[in-house]
Amino acid sequence: MESELYECDVLIIGSGGAGCRAAIEVSEHKLTPIIVSKGLSFKSGCTGMAEGGYNAAFACVDPEDSPDVHFEDTMRGGGFINDPRLVRILVDEAPDRLRDLEEYGALFDRQESGLLDQRPFGGQTYRRTCYHGDRTGHEMITALKEEVIRRDIETIDEVMITSLLVEDGSVLGAMGVSIMNSEPVAFRASSTILASGGAGHIYPVTSNTMQKGGDGFAIAWKAGADLIDMEQVQFHPTGMVYPESRRGVLVTEAVRGEGGILLNSEGERFMGRYDPRGELATRDVVARAIYTEIMEGRGTENGGVYLDVSHLPDEVIEEKLETMLLQFLDVGVDIRSEPMEVAPTAHHFMGGVRIDEWGRTNLKNLFAAGEVSGGVHGANRLGGNALADTQVFGRRAGISAAKNAMSSSRRHVRSLIEEEEQRIKDMVRDGSIRPAEIRDELHEAMWSDVAIVRSRRSLESAMSRISTLMDKLGDLDVPETGGFNSNLLEALELENMLITASLVTRSALIREESRGSHYREDFPETRPEWKRSILLNRKMEPQFIGR
């Protein structure tokens, strides 16, 4: 069947914070954007799940804070392989982008004086995290949604983008599949913005929504985009461990920011042994500390450690950690009097599509913003910087894509659409392997070999297993069902997950040191000669970018 074809000035893939902010900016330029989302618009991304806050150096609580200090903290936290140009833009523009959010209707907690309140997060010299209780992301995405609706921006739900339409190094739009009926859907656009988020679901334990399997990384790489820092995967130190159905669900850093303490099964407050900053060390340090406690036998019976706020006044918990209180009450734990059990969970990809200061990639007409892009956060993201990233670079990508669309004409794409239609059609066939079997094998390989602690042995093992799983894709059982076809969608997702996993593993094998979230037990030291980013091109050939 011939694809349904949509046309627009700017196609935006993803309806989270970065995608919405980009769409608003395109609309501001009097052009026509379309937002396409793999799930329900505004609900399937990770922005709405971000609980802790938004970093901006307003200096409302600590007058000594400034964008310069924010810059230094971010570079230090990222192991100094962040792109300093992007970091400078982030810290300088984050305050104005928060003011934009307030204009859209977002509310942030304030002090009695009326000034914004700011809480401490890991790796900060001064308190700079603006927040709305422990549901900041939800407040942000609600305001952004209302602004998108007010501007009458078209949103298309439940379409999985399967490829970018590329000719002679130029992106002319994208191709996808309707999740509802498995029919092909095509988009022709003068500019395309990737804002599709990360890939937490290449791991079995993650804080991400179900849609985050690396689609954006994979389709960008297949199209010829350069990716950087793909070895840098952040494991948030505190995800739920019990019950099994909630394993990996985020326990916000705001819990530690408000004074929560980490205890092992022996009742020891252990973080002081690992870092003088204690519970507010950077996430990579805290995650490895918790991992070590568990591996050395000081974990809880459910495979975690304790996070305790019972010493805090009830009113602090009820007002500033309300979501956490309700989240744990739902599983029978009252955090006002009982500790939480937590363990690391795959959370954020610092690496991604390489961008410049305006979200441009190495492919003409393709832009990227948010978690799918790389360079802002380096080897480790500071809590509170991600939400700021979505707004700062979502806006910039929107401006850049709009200007590009004004000077570009839409080109004929029918032959490119037909090629992708045929590729998807050919995936429907009889085979001997269910997609879920390969996904489970991938999860096991990534969790055991490419997670918090890595080595040459583990990474080479993972590369071999991923290659074997790639070979099995040709024998997937994807029967024709008519209408909704879960096996087809799983098969399409699996290819993207395997590509993303191979990018992560390949890059991790190349970096022979430990830096930020990338820890090699065979190279445990940070080495000065590795103060550089690893770039992988379409041929998986590494290039190095000195920082």
Swiss-Prot record:
Record keywords, A-Z: Cytoplasm, Flavoprotein, Oxidoreductase
pH dependence: Optimum pH is7.0.
Subcellular location: Cytoplasm
Annotated cofactor note: Binds 1 flavin covalently per subunit.
UniProt xrefs under Pfam families: FAD_binding_2, Succ_DH_flav_C
Temperature dependence of activity: Optimum temperature is 75 degrees Celsius.
Catalytic activity of the protein: coenzyme B + coenzyme M + fumarate = coenzyme M-coenzyme B heterodisulfide + succinate
BP terms from Gene Ontology: fumarate metabolic process
Documented EC number(s): 1.3.4.1
Needed co-factor(s): an oxidized flavin
GO molecular-function terms, A-Z: flavin adenine dinucleotide binding; oxidoreductase activity, acting on the CH-CH group of donors
Cellular component terms per the entry's GO annotation: cytoplasm
Top-level taxonomic group: Archaea
Keyword Lipid biosynthesis attached: no
Enzyme class, UniProt record, top EC level: oxidoreductase
Signal peptide extent: none
InterPro entries xrefs: FAD-dep_OxRdtase_2_FAD-bd (IPR003953), FAD/NAD-bd_sf (IPR036188), Fum_R/Succ_DH_flav-like_C_sf (IPR037099), Fum_Rdtase/Succ_DH_flav-like_C (IPR015939), SdhA/FrdA/AprA (IPR030664), Succ_DH/fumarate_Rdtase_cat_sf (IPR027477)
Protein family (similarity comment): Belongs to the FAD-dependent oxidoreductase 2 family.
Task of the protein: Catalyzes the reduction of fumarate with reduced coenzyme M (CoM-S-H) and coenzyme B (CoB-S-H). In vitro, is able to reduces fumarate with reduced benzyl viologen, oxidize CoM-S-H and CoB-S-H to CoM-S-S-CoB with methylene blue, and reduce CoM-S-S-CoB with reduced benzyl viologen. The enzyme has specificity for the two thiol compounds as the CoB--CoM heterodisulfide reductase. The enzyme is very sensitive to oxygen.
Quaternary structure and partners: Subunit A of the heterodimeric fumarate reductase of methanogenic Archaea, composed of subunits A (TfrA) and B (TfrB).
Protein name per its UniProtKB record: Fumarate reductase (CoM/CoB) subunit A
Gene name per UniProt: tfrA
